[in-house]
A protein has these predicted regions:
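N-terminal catalytic cores of NTP/NDP-binding nucleotidyl/phosphoryl-transfer enzymes
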Residues: 14-89, 94-96, 124-127, 134
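A short acidic, glycine-rich active-site loop
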Residues: 98-100
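Single conserved hydrophobic/aromatic residue that forms the stacking wall/gate
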Residues: 1-12
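Metal-cofactor-binding active-site regions of metalloenzymes
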Residues: 116, 120-123, 127-128
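Active-site cores that bind ATP or allylic diphosphates and position pyrophosphate for catalysis
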Residues: 126, 133-180
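A glycine-rich helix N-cap at a beta->alpha junction
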Residues: 106-118
Length: 180
């Protein structure tokens, strides 16, 4: 006979998740069942958290908690966007240094999420800690003609991505027509 904890574990491993691409519920099959890794976009820290920030934190935390009951090791990473036009605007408006603003609102965000009972991610990388990698990726995209520069911005060259918009179910040709 199978003990209860093992039976419960088998039930949990039959957990289904909604696949955005297929539109169907599918059984979760980790790439590596010995170490499940999850990455989720985190907040842009220029002001107090809003309900959308809290929703994502709660949903991601719930998923991580469920997975931790099923798998030996789960690592949850959620970034902190600490450089962005909104942050630059907040710095200009308040006269505060960008790092002061982002440190303050990162701490407030983490405190607010903890007050909601959300477990914080295992790792919270800051965007500014990865600027070199971003620049390298942008250069590569431009070299491969998958991105281009226009009016001080780097934009995706949508026709270079056959499946661009597939997850959002948006028509690629309409997105091309609306590009800059």
């Amino acid at each position: 006979t199978q003990d209860r904890s093992s039976a419960a574990s088998d039930v949990y491993k039959r957990q289904q998740l909604q696949n955005t691409l297929s539109g169907k519920k599918e059984f979760f099959k980790p790439v590596n069942p010995d170490h499940v890794r999850i990455y989720a976009c985190g907040p842009t820290v220029y002001n107090f958290a809003h309900i959308g920030n809290a929703r994502m934190a709660v949903v991601n935390d719930l998923l991580v908690r469920v997975l931790k009951t099923q798998y030996k090791k789960v690592t949850y990473v959620s970034n902190i966007t600490d450089i962005d036009d909104k942050i630059i605007d907040a710095s200009k408006e308040t006269g505060e240094d960008i790092s002061v603003i982002t440190s303050k609102y990162t701490e407030i965000y983490n405190n607010d999420m903890s007050a909601l009972g959300v477990n914080l991610p295992d790792i919270q990388p800051r965007a500014t800690d990865h600027i070199k990698e971003m620049i390298g990726l942008i250069k590569k995209l431009i070299e491969e003609e998958k991105a281009y520069e226009k009016e001080g911005h780097v934009l995706f060259h949508v026709p270079a991505f056959e499946n661009y918009g597939i997850l959002s179910k948006r028509n690629r040709d309409e997105q091309i027509a609306g590009s800059r």
